[in-house]
Design a protein with these regions (language model features):
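Glycine-rich, basic loop-to-helix element that forms the pyrophosphate-binding segment
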Residues: 21, 61-79, 89-91
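Non-catalytic, C-terminal membrane-associated alpha-helical segments of glycosyltransferases
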Residues: 228-236, 247-308
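Short aromatic/hydrophobic "clamp" motif used to bind/position activated sugar donors
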Residues: 84
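Acidic helix N-cap motif at the loop->helix transition within catalytic regions
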Residues: 44-52
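Conserved donor NDP-sugar-binding/catalytic core segment of glycosyltransferases
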Residues: 92-129, 135-137
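Cell-envelope/extracellular polymer assembly enzymes that use nucleotide-activated donors
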Residues: 3-6, 34, 194
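A short, conserved alpha-helix in the catalytic core of glycosyltransferases
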Residues: 162-213
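Short, acidic, metal-binding catalytic loop of nucleotide-sugar glycosyltransferases
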Residues: 23-32
Length: 308
């Protein structure tokens, strides 16, 4: 019998986009799946519309916005599948996507997470993700391989990678049972990267499946340069490093933060005349000064290797 796949999507104030995703799922060739849609307290209650037009969807409406990790965790908890496909609502799937994502799990039991090749919906030949580089232990950033490159087959080789992409990642249920759900302390940004570090420390591998494709309408929910992003991306970059590096390495990162990241961020928002962005950038930094419990953890093997 085919394993059950639970498709978990999170929606927030983007009902039209969510419906477009659900419509794209009608063409899926894999037939043993369920869809769980979690609404993160959108201003417009979509309950009746979803239940009327998509009666097969298991719909959950949160009373408050729990963020990316918290909202998805609600869906993960409700999932019955052997595999959980966590996918952004601002994507559209290709017919054989689930089939392709399942294949690597059958070949290597150590694989815990699989992400497909991700392309931009607005420019279908342009790649957003074809795997990830290792996290730079000094800058606190990882780079999506193939980002904004024309797809000419140069990233058609599947293989192990450092991180899955939060917009589309299939996770084996065994992984969640062993590691736990996504760390909701992040709320938005870096949560899947932190989760990946936990997953790797537990002995699982992360895999990039080049044969599976999905199209992403990037940043429909929060905007490419939103004040929300300025806050959480800044805050969580520091938080990630606190949780996943040694004290010595975090000290080196802090020097980079003070000498490069902070001056560059301040200058950028001042020159762009974006006072709200500037305020949120500073708030994101200051949050880490006041929040004391997220002590640096033990570096994963990949982070240790990057330090050598």
């Amino acid at each position: 019998m085919k394993p059950l796949v639970s498709i978990v999507i999170l929606s927030y104030n983007q009902l039209k986009v969510s419906c477009e995703f659900l419509d794209s799922c009608r063409a899926l060739s894999y037939d043993n799946y369920e869809i769980i849609m979690v609404d993160n307290a959108s201003a417009e209650d979509p309950t009746q519309l979803i239940k009327t037009n998509y009666p097969y969807v298991r719909f959950i409406r949160n009373e408050q916005n729990l963020g990316f990790a918290g909202g998805n965790n609600i869906g993960i908890a409700a999932a019955k599948g052997d595999y959980i496909f966590i996918v952004n609502n601002d994507t559209e799937v290709t017919p054989d996507l689930l089939d392709k994502l399942l294949e690597p799990f059958q070949k290597d039991p150590a694989i815990g997470v699989v992400s497909p090749k991700i392309k931009y919906f607005s420019n279908p030949t342009l790649i957003q993700y074809a795997g990830y580089t290792a996290m730079n232990p000094f800058t606190g950033q990882a780079v999506a391989i193939g980002h904004k490159q024309e797809d000419q087959g140069q990233h058609d080789k599947s293989g192990y990678t450092n991180f899955a992409h939060g917009a589309a990642m299939m996770v084996k249920k065994e992984v969640i049972e062993k590691v736990g759900a996504m760390p909701d302390i992040f709320f938005l940004y870096y949560e899947e990267l932190d989760w990946a570090e936990q997953i790797k420390r537990a002995g699982f591998k992360i895999y990039y499946q080049a044969e599976g494709e999905i199209f992403h309408k990037e940043s429909v929910s929060v905007g490419k340069e939103s004040p929300l992003k300025a806050y959480y991306h800044t805050r969580n970059r520091v938080l990630f490093m606190r949780r996943n590096t040694s004290p010595f390495q975090f000290t080196l990162f802090s020097l980079f933060l003070v000498t490069c990241v902070i001056p560059k961020g301040l200058l950028k928002y001042i020159l762009k005349r974006q006072p709200i962005h500037l305020k949120n950038f500073i708030r994101g930094l200051w949050w880490n000064v006041g929040y004391r419990t997220a002590k640096p953890g033990h570096p994963s093997p990949s982070m240790q290797a990057a330090l050598r």
